[in-house]
């Protein structure tokens, strides 16, 4: 059943960003991910990643794209549309 985007609080990728970091070999810390995103030209800190993962911060489309590239995962997967 499709979920209504109007009922979602925070962001829809919070858990998947955390899981995506854990799936890396070796697992990636929030600091590692922030460093990688900064190297790719995005101003992202470990604190921001923490807030995203705790569903305390929204993620814009450009950030979602960069997170997917940094983690080597599709945007659809990060949004929970793929297993």
Stretches found by the model and what they are:
Residues 25-51:
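Short alpha-helical DNA-recognition segment
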Residues 47, 54-69:
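Short, basic-rich loop-to-helix N-cap that marks the start of a DNA-contacting helix
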Residues 1-26, 76:
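A short, Lys/Arg-rich alpha-helix, primarily the initiator
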Residues 33, 63-71, 78-79:
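Hydrophobic micro-packing sites on short alpha-helices
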Residues 6-10, 41, 56:
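Residue-level marker of regulatory loop/turn positions in helix-turn-helix DNA-binding domains and
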Residues 22, 38-39, 54, 83:
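Residue-level detection of the helix-turn-helix DNA-binding "recognition helix"
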């Amino acid at each position: 059943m499709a979920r209504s985007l109007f009922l979602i609080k925070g962001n829809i990728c919070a858990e998947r960003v955390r899981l995506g970091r854990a799936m890396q070999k070796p697992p990636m810390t929030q600091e590692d991910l922030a460093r990688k995103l900064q190297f790719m030209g995005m101003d992202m800190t470990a604190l921001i990643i923490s807030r995203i993962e705790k569903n305390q911060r929204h993620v814009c489309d450009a950030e979602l794209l960069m997170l997917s590239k940094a983690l080597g995962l599709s945007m659809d997967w990060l949004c929970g549309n793929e297993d």
